[in-house]
Amino acid sequence: MNRLFKKTLSLMLVIVMTVSLGVSAAAADQTGAAQAEGPLGIVSAMSVELNALVEATKISKTEEIAGNTFYEGVLNGVDVVLVKAGIGKVLAASCAETLIDTYHVGGIVFTGIAGGVGDDVNVMDMVIATELVQHDYGTETNSGFEWNGKAGSNQETGMIPVDESLSKIAYDSAC
């Protein structure tokens, strides 16, 4: 990835959440994750998070769908569709659905400034998920976390696996 893009991303705390959408590891490499399956969808919660990506992308088309602006273009040689979802998982899910149904993306990356991600994470740190959990499907008690939902792939822990090829690309671009 080019220096401008790396520098831009290093200016903010970035949480990268990858969602497995059937991108084959063979199709994903440093030059084009998800290209065999479709463009890469990139979702941000806030304008400040999306603006740096829009500026670094050669935009070919802008489209308004359900009150959201979708930017199609090429970012560092990768076909992408960028969108600001707004804050919250319902808005993110709505944009993810549009990316899948309308743009036929091969994968989705969520990037943004996160609040309350832990004491060991500082501003300008990049955090790349290896697995995810829906935070409100359990309760933290004095005895530990008590899982009470069925949101994740692993019914015992609620953890949701991420696409390893997308995580590797995020990691490699950050280093």
Say what each PLM segment does:
Residues M1-M12:
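Bacterial N-terminal signal peptides that target proteins for export
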Residues M12-S20:
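Bacterial N-terminal signal peptides
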Residues V19-A36:
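Sec-dependent signal peptide cleavage junction
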Residues G32-E97, Y103:
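N-terminal short beta-loop-beta anion/metal-coordinating cradle
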Residues D101-Y103, D120-V121:
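Alpha-helix C-terminal capping segments
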Residues H104-V109:
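Proline-aspartate-enriched helix->loop->beta-strand connector
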Residues G118-C175:
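Mid-sequence, gly/pro-rich, charge-dense loop/helix-turn segments that line enzyme active sites
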